[in-house]
Regions:
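C-terminal hydrophobic helical "lid"/dimerization subdomain
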Residues: 1-3, 287-339
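Short N-terminal strand-loop motif that marks the start
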Residues: 1-62, 124-127, 131, 333-339
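Glycine-rich beta-strand-centered segment in the early N-terminal region that forms part
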Residues: 20-35, 48-95, 120, 140
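Short, well-ordered loop/turn sites that connect or cap secondary structure elements
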Residues: 74-75, 168, 249
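Mid-domain Rossmann-like dinucleotide-binding core that forms the NAD(H)/NADP(H) cofactor-binding site
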Residues: 79, 138-221
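NAD(P)H dinucleotide-binding glycine-rich loop of Rossmann-like/cofactor-binding domains
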Residues: 90-177
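Glycine-rich phosphate-binding loop and adjacent beta-alpha segment
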Residues: 195, 239-299, 332-339
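A short acidic, Gly/Pro-enriched loop at the edge of an enzyme's catalytic core
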Residues: 224-232
Length: 339
């Protein structure tokens, strides 16, 4: 089989690799049918990753099961979402919902970067899934795999960034400072779940147009809005934008940072203390809440497909992926996306 391999800044190529095989009765082998890059893939291709090349990349896809171990509930032909992080489903952390911190594998075990072991990437023709019953989630009927290619990471991450807060604070005012798909998904979800106001901040006019289609107000940039928002979501990876988000919170407000902060910076800690700000900077435990996020996607209240910026053939991955796109989706001619 082939796997898309990151080899240098803005450069990826197909490389041959052995076909994966079942290593236990709980494994599955899947073939991605619709895959997309996330913010981490973009950072890696831009040369910001912590691991030097070469390595297989990609950690967002909807896939079709092609083989499964005897103890697995999955069968060949099933359409499934593959979470980006490796998790066993039974250790204390997995049982507590901390699936990104599974103790059965090395810290940071994931698809798309050999940080906690080598698990391959989801831009590969075939992928072995350990603990398939714990990891894989069936794609609900009626959902388009192309629209949900980011259900491995960015879509359920966006759900987690806003849905629990709106449950705790119905009608909350939401500020989103972003540069792409995560922030746009947040706008869609926030409006669907009853946010009274959503302001999306992004210098890209095309991104702002999508946010406006979701019912958000938009701006290219802002100064801090004193006590303006109950929840702020930052997904730029830029500390100045994070500071703006923090300084815009109302008393006892919450800031979720989903940016990959590769550069250091200072935070306004005294202001945060005086306002009563809670800041969370974290990788997402996707598998724990993926079923809830997919349930919302299947409800018809949201439209994640609007964020898809183009659909491309699988063979175009080496040429198209290094280019700057909002959310390109790559599909396989040999693995139809239909059920």
């Amino acid at each position: 089989m082939r796997e898309l391999t990151y080899v240098a800044r803005r450069t990826a190529e197909w490389r041959e690799a052995p076909d994966p095989v079942l290593q236990s009765d709980s494994d599955a082998i899947v073939a991605p049918v619709a895959a997309a890059p996330c913010d981490v893939d973009s950072a890696i291709l831009a040369g910001h990753g912590p691991i030097p090349p070469p390595f297989a990349i990609g950690h967002e896809c909807v896939a079709r099961v092609v083989d499964a171990g005897e103890s697995s509930r999955f069968s060949p032909g099933n359409l499934v979402v593959v979470p980006w992080a490796i998790s066993c489903g039974t250790c204390d952390r997995c049982a507590g919902g901390l699936t990104t911190h599974c103790t059965s594998v090395p810290h940071m075990a994931m698809f798309g970067a050999p940080i906690g072991g080598s698990w391959g990437g989801l831009f590969s023709d075939l992928v072995r899934i350990p603990w398939a019953d714990a990891m894989l989630v069936p794609l609900p009927g009626g959902l388009d795999p192309m629209a949900m290619a980011s259900a491995s990471d960015n879509w359920p991450l966006a759900w987690r960034l806003v849905a629990p807060h709106l449950r705790a604070r119905p009608g909350a005012r939401v500020l989103v400072i972003a540069r792409g798909s995560i922030g746009l998904y947040v706008c869609d979800i926030a409006r669907a779940l009853g946010a009274s106001d959503v302001l999306y901040v992004d210098p890209d006019p095309a991104h702002r147009a999508i946010a406006e289609g979701y019912g958000a107000r938009t701006a290219a940039e802002i100064e801090p809005v004193h006590h303006g928002f109950d929840l702020a979501v930052e997904s730029t990876g830029r500390v100045p934008e994070l500071v703006t988000a923090l300084r815009s919170l109302a008393p006892e407000g919450f800031c979720e940072s989903a940016g990959n902060h590769f550069r250091p910076g200072e935070l306004p800690l005294l202001e945060m203390y005086l306002t009563g700000v809670t800041l969370r900077v974290a990788r997402d435990n996707v598998r724990a809440h993926l079923p809830q996020a997919l349930e919302l996607a299947a409800s018809g209240q949201v439209d994640p497909g609007r964020v898809v910026s183009g659909v491309f053939d699988w063979e175009q991955l080496p040429e198209v992926l290094p280019e700057r796109h909002l959310k390109p989706v790559f599909v396989r001619a040999d693995q139809p996306v239909g059920r």
